[in-house]
A protein has these predicted regions:
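Sec-dependent N-terminal signal peptides
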Residues: 4-12
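Hydrophobic membrane-targeting alpha-helices
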Residues: 13-17
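N-terminal module-boundary/linker segments of secreted carbohydrate-active enzymes
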Residues: 18-98
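A generic structural signal for ordered alpha-helices
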Residues: 30, 103-104, 126, 181
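Short alpha-helical segments and helix-capping/turn motifs at coil-helix boundaries
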Residues: 67-76, 104, 129-133, 186-190
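Short, His- and charge-rich active-site/binding loops that engage polyanionic ligands
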Residues: 87, 94-119
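Domain-level detector of nuclease and nuclease-like folds
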Residues: 109-121, 125-238
């Protein structure tokens, strides 16, 4: 995947990051990385998170909602599993065999849908209802992924969680049902194991990028704070 999920480094000191980049074969990349992260050198914990949030705000470019449907064919092209250039949809991808269906054309974007495979659309891993579809969150490529429209509708604005007794299961095994993890007992959506790390990193990014706003968002995944961001049960899940 080409997505730059930068917030992996939240668990690292910038010294560690510098060690990672110092062995890069691309000197231009080393130089630009060092410059980009110069303001957070020596920071850790919530101070690092806040500094990264400020840097992300300064450099963020909102490309608009419509552009996502086009860029997905480059950013999310399947080069890891089927290697066929179709969109790599976490809610329909079958990592161990052929996909039940694929999306390989911009014309397959939703519209309406009645079942899986009808069309693809934009899945907000952090539900847009929590921020009332406001920009730039609604258009933010780093948490808005391509997905089957029908499965996206099933996920709705539910939190991610673990499901032992699903009410509904997608063709690739993603599940909808009552959460069986931790104390929260609402309805949740569980993607397949292959992509749980991708989703966790995207949500880590979101919680950092929008630190200045997220305290006012309302959702079961949140704890109402700007620093920790996510509720205790959800942090353990991630």
């Amino acid at each position: 995947r080409m997505r730059l999920l930068l917030l992996i480094i939240l668990s690292l000191s910038l010294t560690s990051f510098a060690k990672m980049t110092s062995h890069s074969e691309n000197s231009d990349m080393k130089s630009s990385s060092a410059s980009y992260y110069s303001s957070v050198i020596g920071l850790s914990g919530f101070k690092l998170k806040t500094a990264l949030s400020a840097q992300l705000r300064r450099t963020h470019q909102d490309r608009g909602y419509g552009s996502l449907l086009t860029v997905y064919f480059k950013s999310d092209a399947d080069t890891s599993y089927d290697n066929d250039g179709s969109i790599m949809d976490m809610y329909s991808e079958n990592p161990s065999s052929y996909d039940p269906y694929t999306f390989s054309n911009r014309k397959q974007a939703c519209g309406s849908y009645k079942r899986e495979a009808d069309c693809f659309n934009r899945e907000h891993l952090f539900p847009q209802s929590a921020f009332r579809k406001s920009r730039p969150m609604r258009n933010d490529f780093f948490h808005v992924y391509p997905s089957d429209g029908y499965v996206n509708g099933k996920r709705s604005n539910h939190a991610f969680g673990e499901v032992n007794n699903p009410k509904w299961t997608s063709q690739n095994g993603s599940k909808l049902g009552i959460n069986s993890f931790g104390k929260f007992r609402g309805t949740v959506f569980e993607p397949i194991d292959e992509f749980k790390g991708d989703i966790a990193r995207a949500l880590l990014y979101f919680g950092t990028r929008y630190e200045d706003r997220i305290g006012s968002f309302k959702h079961a995944m949140l704890d109402g704070s700007r620093d920790k961001v996510y509720a205790g049960w959800f942090m353990k899940l991630l």
